[in-house]
Swiss-Prot record:
It comes from the Eukaryota. It comes from Danio rerio (Zebrafish). Residues 129-140 have a biased composition (Polar residues). This is LysM and putative peptidoglycan-binding domain-containing protein 2. Residues 65-109 form the LysM domain. The gene is lysmd2.
Length: 208
């Protein structure tokens, strides 16, 4: 079978006849060179975050405490003491196994910092804490030159006084007044008669 060669684009004619340039495909490089260039390009892209000067790989809110290793201690016990994982201690101190802690006199324990950490200029605080902070009410300024809205038409209040079914005339009022006077006179006369009868009864009782 015939071998297919890459297409060679022609170069400009300089007067010395048509010549062919280099092939479209670049020359194959060694594996070490390509790997090193790839790692360098990835490192350049990860050093800075978009729109900020903060480093992506920088530790966020993390500080280290020096712990002195004593006999009988285990990596699990140290991790439980400081509230971290064994993988974090091994990563910071570059330990390959749990038994390697006795090869070092001290260990660096990563703990969370109490200070607020900033990432891309923003605080890493949880949104729950923001809800507890009191919010200031916005100040609303009124424009003096703006025309005031027209007053609303006043609604007449309902009459709370009970309306009588029949209005009393002056004649009816005087008639009722006369009846009350007559009734009071009759009552006074009756009381007087009752008092006279009691006196007569007492006098007759004394005579007996």
């Amino acid at each position: 079978m015939a071998e297919f060669s890459p297409v060679l684009p022609p170069l400009r004619d300089d007067g010395g006849g048509g010549r062919y340039g280099q092939p479209l495909f670049p020359r194959s490089r060694s594996g070490s060179e390509s790997d090193s260039e790839l790692s360098q390009s990835l490192a350049r892209t990860k050093t800075r975050s978009y729109g900020s000067t903060a480093s992506v790989t920088a530790p966020l809110g993390e500080k280290y405490i020096e712990h002195r290793v004593t006999d009988g201690e285990t990596l699990q016990g140290i991790a439980l003491k400081y509230g971290v994982t064994m993988e974090q201690i091994k990563r910071v101190n570059k330990l390959f196994s749990n038994d390697c802690i006795f090869l070092r006199n001290t260990l660096s324990i990563p703990v969370k910092s109490e200070k607020r950490s900033l990432f891309n200029g923003l605080s890493l605080e949880s949104p729950d804490s923001e809800g507890n902070t009191p919010q200031e009410s916005p100040c609303v300024s009124q424009d003096v030159d703006a025309p005031s809205p027209p007053p609303e038409p006043s609604v007449p209040e309902p009459n709370t006084r009970p309306v009588q079914a029949e209005e009393l005339s002056a004649k009816d009022y005087l008639h009722r007044l006369d009846l009350q006077i007559k009734q009071s006179k009759l009552a006074a006369r009756k009381l007087k008669e009752d008092g006279g009868r009691e006196e007569d009864d007492t006098n007759s009782y004394q005579e007996i």
